[in-house]
Amino acid sequence: EVGLLIPSRLLRETSRAATRAENQNSGRLRAPVNRAKTYNLAMIDLSSLFGQIDIYLFDQLLRGRIGPGMTVLDAGCGHGRNLVFFLRQAYQISAVDPDPDAVRAVRSLAGRLAPQLPLSNFRAEAVESSSFPDHAADVVISSAVLHFARDESHFQAMLRGTWRLVKPNGLFFCRLASSIGMESRFTSLGGRRFALPDGTERFLVDEPYLLELTSGLGGALADPLKTTVVQDRRCMTTWVLRKVA
């Protein structure tokens, strides 16, 4: 059973995982270490601890912004890829997703990793109209959700339905598709809907729009905007806000 970890111990835990794997691989006869197998075992151990957590959300953990005892709500949780670590570490977790099958999967995950949490914490609802109360969590996650908005009105409803869940001084972590860095590579479908080179259609934001939204929400950037350009396919921007009290 994995014990509680504070953010400052996360890097040490990853190192220990590699050490444990190497010790398992060394054997009684101290045979030569198979490095590929060692690190494969380490990655299995890390995957068990962290799941498939978004690397930029992991960065927030390492920087101490999401600490033990905080309430965390995943708005658009999918099958729970970002929740494994938080469930293992006894955070107070809630989640919402419009897909009932996804919510059933998250309830099953929580039942194994955090059976003390009530199933009512995990709800099959649209993020724009969830039944969670205002100021429900210290940290609200919106990872790869908002770019599925049908149009501007839907985007605004999803965003504001998510933002209202953040407590005063709380953290809003969002990753969403954008046009930043590939402005000329997208085909407009009207409004902010675009066809992407990877064959998908998305609602895309840009830097001026995100800054305008930040001001309109009454938030403050916790980090500068960060955008990852996936070679000639799409762009994903990390938008992290603090809710000003």
Model-derived segments and spans:
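Short linear motifs in low-complexity or flexible loops
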Residues: 3, 14-21
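Class I (Rossmann-like) S-adenosyl-L-methionine-dependent methyltransferase catalytic domain
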Residues: 35-67, 73, 78-129, 171-245
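A short acidic, Gly/Pro-enriched loop at the edge of an enzyme's catalytic core
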Residues: 128-140
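A short SAM/SAH-binding and catalytic strip from SAM-dependent methyltransferases
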Residues: 139-153
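A short glycine-rich, Lys/Arg-flanked "PGG" loop and its adjoining helix->strand segment in the class I
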Residues: 156-168
